[in-house]
Amino acid sequence: MVSKYRHVGVIVTDMEKSIEFYCDLLGHKKLVDFTEKGNYFSSLIGLDNAEARVVKAGTPDGTFVELIQFTTHEAIPPATTKFNAIGCNHVCFTVDDIESLYDRMSSRGVKFVTRPLQSDFDPVKTCFCYDPDGTLVQFVEIAEPLEWEQN
């Protein structure tokens, strides 16, 4: 059985821009920055002679984002970035002040789908933006504990 959510892996094309987004703008702490290569790595991911720079950026609850920039294989753009595309769609972070986050990130050129919106059915505000490579990132500000999250 699964005991805990650990991380989300994000393939990036410019590690420095991604570190700026996830660490400088969102406040993740850069935990490690290393090169992954060798037989183990290539076998694990199914790419011959793979090498990648990996940065793990953590949140206070112990989960982290694993940023991966391949140095031996060209990054393949997704077939679509539409919200209804099948598969892993977005990563979501809980934040304390979504309006301030939106203002700060917008002023730094981050593209948002919309301003933060109040949910019609839960005491939350939420919005989506795009990271430097177009990955959808959601933010949620929770005004009061959600009953279904308490169980």
Regions found by a protein language model. Give the residues of each.
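Core segments of cupin and vicinal oxygen chelate
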Residues: 11-62, 100, 107
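Residue-level detector of high-confidence beta-strand sites
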Residues: 31-33, 115, 139
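Generic structural signal for helix capping and beta-alpha/helix-loop junctions
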Residues: 38-40, 75, 122, 146
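A short, polar/charged loop-to-alpha-helix boundary motif
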Residues: 145-151
